[in-house]
Every structure is written in C-alpha cells, then in structure tokens.
Amino acid sequence: LTLFRAQKSAGTLPDTTADVSETAVTAALRFEPVAFEAGHLLEYDIAPGLSARGDGARLGQALAVLLDNAVKYAAPGTPIQLDAARQGSRAVLAVTNRGEDIPADKLPHIFDRFYRADEARTDGSSFGLGLAIAKAIVDAHRGVIRCESGGGVTRFIISLPLAAGKQERGTDHV
C-alpha cells in the first residue's frame, strides 16, 4: 500500500517546501536508539537550510528505509553515517555503512519491487519493498537515488533539486 501511494503521488506532491535538513535530523534522532540497540553508533553531519519542494514526511520515510537497511546490514560494531549537504542546485543525502558489499551484478535490481540481493541475509520479515518505496518517494520529488557498494562500504545517495530560492553556489560534497 505504501509503494502504491508513493508511485501514485509522483505528479501530485503538495505545493510546499520540505525542510530537508530538519527531516534528516529527525530521521537521525529517530534511528540513534535503533542503531545503538543493534550495536552501532549513528553519526551524522547535516548542513542547515536545505529545502526541496515536496513532502518532508515522505522524504523522512525514504530516509527511514535507508537507515533501517544500514542498521540491518552493517558489520557488527561499525558506525553508520548520515550526511546531508548542498551540491550546487541540489540537496544530497547519503547513508553509509560498512559491511558485506552488494554484488555489482545485483546493484541494478535493488530498487525493483520484491527484489532482495541476498536471500540468506533476510530473516523472513522483509518483502523486498523498502528500497522500491524509497525510490518511488524520491522519484515523486524529482530526485535521484542510487547505491555504491565496494571495499566493504555501501552508500545510498539521494539527490533532490533545491526549492526555488534556495539554490546557492556551493561545492560541499557528500
């Protein structure tokens, strides 16, 4: 149902501005105890003043999917990192964890519905919809989501166009 709603709303986002920085901080604060309980430290570096046209609660859902996956798949005792920065005319968010790589041949499929890169890594409670939901939400916000995985580091990156009037020159990199 969540995936259906995310896909259906692709052209019907509210004509409001979402505070991406606040959304990222809220997600970090929400997941700090979850990460801690799982033996991880959640670190975050969030630039202030990032905003995008759309729905902050929906963007928070997308971040929750990425943070939840990072907690599930991070190697024991390793930190999880959430970053948000301005890159030119875009707000870029990244969730990074250390652990087993997602194989390169699986990366093109990880945002497909019901796809799981490794059936052995699931506890049976997952249906393979989380990343599809995150992608549908990001797509609805005219953004891009991608994943890089290699060398024991997996990083999910969301890039969103900044709201009108918020596009400043900058070279902050995530």
State where each predicted segment sits:
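Short conserved segment of the HATPase_c
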Residues: 102-114
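Conserved catalytic submotifs in the C-terminal HATPase_c
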Residues: 14-17, 36, 41-51
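Conserved glycine-rich
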Residues: 40, 142-143
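Conserved micro-motifs of the catalytic ATP-binding
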Residues: 6-13, 51-54
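Short beta-strand/loop element within the Bergerat-fold HATPase_c
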Residues: 77-89
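Short alpha-helical Gxxx[C/S/T] motif in the catalytic ATP-binding
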Residues: 130, 134
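Short helix-loop "hinge" at the ATP-lid/N-box region of the Bergerat-fold HATPase_c
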Residues: 70-71
